[in-house]
Amino acid sequence: MRSSITRRTFVKTAAGIAATAAIPLWASGKLNVGIGTYSYHNLSMDDMIVQLTALGIKEIEMSRGEFMLMHHPGDDLFRTARTKLDRAGIGCVSYYTATIKDVQDLENAVRFAKLLGVRNITGDATDMLPQIDQRLSHEGLTFGIHNHYFKGERFAYESPEDVLNALASLSKTVGATADVGHFASCGHDPVDALRKLASRLKLVHLKDIEAPGGEVNVLLGKGISRIPEVMQELHRQSFTGLVAVEYEKEGSVEDDMRQEVAFARKLA
């Protein structure tokens, strides 16, 4: 039996599918789900890229330990990573520095960000925030203050109010990289935190935590981070930044990350 689909119809249909596939997720009302690469800290870069590719991940935040400032990485590490990621069709949109403590750290962070081709830097700083604001405004980059939980320690950025107070005197260049898991660990409602930070939100770390005052990660939807409500709130905000799935665990995370990404995409 002859097919009723002509060549012209086939070409038009294929072109339409390709055009649709090329539209970023957030352009069609979908949240932009990617990965925070600290999740793969036990793997080599090459093995990590294999797993990212298998999951169909297109955007990441570079947060692997060897790239953080306190480990004194060299330029070649970033050049090589950029080459490998580009070859795999994976975009690095943010670089996690950890603490920027002085001018040299800031200069290194800017240089490394350029080598990776990112548009945002995530980290923490206190005295350096005005210099970060000025320097990154000049470079056309943004900075997201990262909230964190440390057991037995008081950290500068635990609550959304801590972050907002730090942002009060800074330009819109500086905002928040909101880690919903760390907010939950510190006893704060992640959804409320996202609402309060909405106008300054640069990036989201999507992780679920077993219990307040703890650091044990669980699969998304299994803990106290209110992940479905978090995603609803990001939809309400029409958030266009990266929603970076993070899962901190020793040992193999391949199956875990497959479940994590599938869960996040279902809510995206």
Q: Where are the predicted features?
A:
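Glycine-rich, proline-tolerant flexible connector loops at the mouths of alpha/beta enzymes
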Residues: 62-80
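Active-site-proximal loop/turn and secondary-structure-junction residues that shape catalytic pockets
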Residues: 39-41, 64-66, 98-101, 127, ...
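Active-site acidic/histidine proton-transfer and metal-coordination neighborhood
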Residues: 15, 20, 47-49, 84, ...
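Conserved beta-strand positions in the central sheet of alpha/beta enzyme cores
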Residues: 61, 94, 122, 144, ...
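A short acidic, helix-capping loop that chelates divalent metal ions and anchors anionic groups
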Residues: 66-70, 151-154, 212-217
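Metal-dependent catalytic neighborhoods of phosphoester/phosphodiester hydrolases
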Residues: 71-75, 103-109, 254
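Histidine-acidic metal/acid-base catalytic patches
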Residues: 2-32, 37, 41-58, 164-178, ...
